[in-house]
Amino acid sequence: MNFQFIPLIGFNTSMYIALDHEFMSQALTEASKSLYLSNPNPRVGCVVVRDGKALGRGYTQKVGGAHAEVQALADVRANGFHPEGSTIYVTLEPCSHTGRTPPCVNELIAAKPALVIVSMSDPNPLVAGKGLEQLRAAGIEVRCGLLRAEAEALNRGFISRMTRGLPWVRLKIAASLDGKTALADGTSQWITGPLARADGHHWRAQACAILTGVGTVKEDNPTLNVRDVDTERQPWRVIVDSKLETPETSKVFDNLDHSGVILVCGKLDTPEKERCAKVFEARGIDVLSLPNANGKVDLPKLFTYLSQEREMIEILV
């Protein structure tokens, strides 16, 4: 899938030395620590360096918490150093707008580094090169583009939401070598092995929501939660159910205080459907009516809703 990225300013791989690649790789390692944590914010890492030595490092925390640059600068000071005259490696252009937190670019300017090296520019229209411009206006040298592909790979969902208004959707599917997905008598709980299941929970933990259909809920009665992954955050559970036929006793409704459920239906055009919707809503379950022309769930509208109204960047199906 092709995205339209903001043109990079000063992108030239020849301007970087081996140490630059090493420390930006370390910044990317920091960014990977945000995989299960920072949604819907991008996964960002930062390393502050002077004379070939890392003075501090950080990565973006959960929503409302410190961004990578702020974490790294705090780490520098906690380690007894100062950032003035340093080189700062950061995997995403520093934000220049006030959202849930103040602009990171202000923190960087106040730190007075000599050089800031950035992997990728920010596709958020509120930033879109403004962070780089402000750093340059403050007299700080800026370079952009080092290990850009790696930084983009960590942020496919964020890029998709910013450039297309849609989340990045992953489809997990498993089949045997003969093309089967289950035994005919329904006795097969899994056809995948432990490594594949562990991989599946990694993708669950990374997602903002796990989406499935009412047929799967009826047949398998899944919990749709994350297990065996070191994360406090559980993704939303989204059930596509045109006729509101999801059994009220389904396991997917367990632990609603820890992970929410969105039931997406077609038209609420019968008294029974309206009754079911009220019962679910009374339990704290969100019921969303998004009918298409045939009265079923309008999937394009659903993905737009999840991106724009719920700020979701990655969906696992």
Predicted regions and their residues:
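Cationic, low-complexity basic patches in intrinsically disordered or flexible, solvent-exposed regions
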Residues: F5
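Short, basic/aromatic recognition patches
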Residues: D20-N39, R161
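Residue-level signal for inorganic ion chemistry
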Residues: A27, G45, C95, L135, ...
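Short beta-strand scaffold segments in enzyme catalytic cores
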Residues: V44-R50, I173-A174
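Zn2+-dependent cytidine deaminase-like catalytic core
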Residues: V48-E150, W236, I262, G266-D269
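Active-site ligand-binding patch in enzyme domains
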Residues: S160, W168-L177, T181-E311
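Helical hairpin unit composed of two closely spaced alpha helices linked by a short loop
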Residues: I313-I315
